[in-house]
Amino acid sequence: MIDLRALEKDFDTIATRLQTKGVEEKVLAELKELFEEYKKEKTILQELQTKQNSLSKMFGQYKREGKDINELKNELEINKGKIAAHQEVVRDLEEKLKNIALTIPNPPDPDVPVGENEEDNVVLKTVLEPKGFDFEPKEHWELGEKLGWIDFERGVKLAKSRFSVLKKEAARLERALINFMLDHNKEYGFEEVCVPFMANSATLLGTGQLPKFEEDLFKICDEDLYMIPTAEVPLTNLYRDEIIKDLEDPIKLTAYTPCFRKEAGSGGRDVRGMIRQHQFDKVELVAITRPEESDKVFDEMVKCASSLLAKLGLPHRHVMLCTGDLGFSAAKTIDLEVWLPGQGKYREISSISNTRDFQARRAQIRFKDGKKNRLVHTLNGSSLAVGRTLIAIMENYQQKDGSIAIPKVLESYL
């Protein structure tokens, strides 16, 4: 959730940054109007409370001096009633502000490039150059169907479109990749955790999926439960409503989970193949840090995911997302895009995001800093999306005879 105190101090600067993320002017105008009313009522309340303190002191002095206190007593009662009324008004305005604030995204960091969509993202660097083929490389769905690795028809029969069945070497590779990724993440200091694949509404509110993006979630009927869209949700919320006593070192977690998304906003993109599925496997990284450590940890997480792709011999690039392409909770994001020769383009395979204290404020995750309790910073990222990694291996390691070679680092996992 956005910092209402920071908003109070510098509304215009934060509002300008939010506009670059696509927040409509009328929403910001409504927020500003409500905020001005809140500040006015809060000032009146503070003045009434100050007056009450002065009257109370005067009342005590009058009693000690034997003066008539009836008029003063009456004034105290009247002022007390005004305080109660204004407290109710302030509470009501705070609730309205909170409800609006829950639907407003995290303002982008000042160094994030301003832009409207993915066309304005900035390529930072390329790791490994795409190799040339002496034949026309095929796309993963064609390879998968010919080899009997991917069964799209039976996926639809079992569920609906955007589901698939992995068979033969593809099923074994999926399992091998999960184990390989978890082992790799452990080398970077991430502790493996097994979490529930469902989450309640408070958990999804904490990481920002609710209330705004409920349409993209699969809800369990008659239960306050949803299928998780990413392991970021349970991993981050492990510390919801907690004060971490010792956060000298960042808490670094990794987990494998299936992920479930309706893809309500996909607009019919990537209907064919496995790029965009309702259910897909992913290995996630989450870090919980002191504010002053989050930039360093962000860089470490990017390095962790990138080195995983490099171990697999997969050409990829680092892309800084512009303000208009940032996710709801992210203040800064670097995408890793892997080269798919069959498609002849780079596709996202990992997003590493620093949410600063945005999720921590929603989930009330704090740490003990001397005598004070401070909000943590939370970070998350894929290391990696397993299905897309499988796709990348199929397309980059395809042979002229239609077979697919296996990266050497995976041989011991098969």
Curated annotation (Swiss-Prot):
Chief location of this protein within or outside the cell: cytoplasm
Reactions catalysed according to its record: tRNA(Ser) + L-serine + ATP = L-seryl-tRNA(Ser) + AMP + diphosphate + H(+); tRNA(Sec) + L-serine + ATP = L-seryl-tRNA(Sec) + AMP + diphosphate + H(+)
Protein's cellular compartments: Cytoplasm
Binding site for L-serine: 230-232, 284, 382
Pathway, per record: Aminoacyl-tRNA biosynthesis; selenocysteinyl-tRNA(Sec) biosynthesis; L-seryl-tRNA(Sec) from L-serine and tRNA(Sec): step 1/1
PROSITE patterns: AA_TRNA_LIGASE_II (PS50862)
UniProt-listed Pfam families: Seryl_tRNA_N, tRNA-synt_2b
Keywords: Aminoacyl-tRNA synthetase, ATP-binding, Cytoplasm, Ligase, Nucleotide-binding, Protein biosynthesis
Keyword Metal-binding: no
Keyword field contains Aminoacyl-tRNA synthetase: yes
Single GO biological process annotation from the record: seryl-tRNA aminoacylation
GO cellular component, one term: cytoplasm
Enzyme Commission designation: 6.1.1.11
A molecular function (GO) term: ATP binding
Binding residue positions for ATP: 261-263, 348-351
Assembly description: Homodimer. The tRNA molecule binds across the dimer.
PANTHER family found in the cross-reference section: SERINE--TRNA LIGASE (PTHR43697:SF1), SERYL-TRNA SYNTHETASE (PTHR43697)
Domain notes: Consists of two distinct domains, a catalytic core and a N-terminal extension that is involved in tRNA binding.
Role according to the record: Catalyzes the attachment of serine to tRNA(Ser). Is also able to aminoacylate tRNA(Sec) with serine, to form the misacylated tRNA L-seryl-tRNA(Sec), which will be further converted into selenocysteinyl-tRNA(Sec).
Stated name of the protein: Serine--tRNA ligase
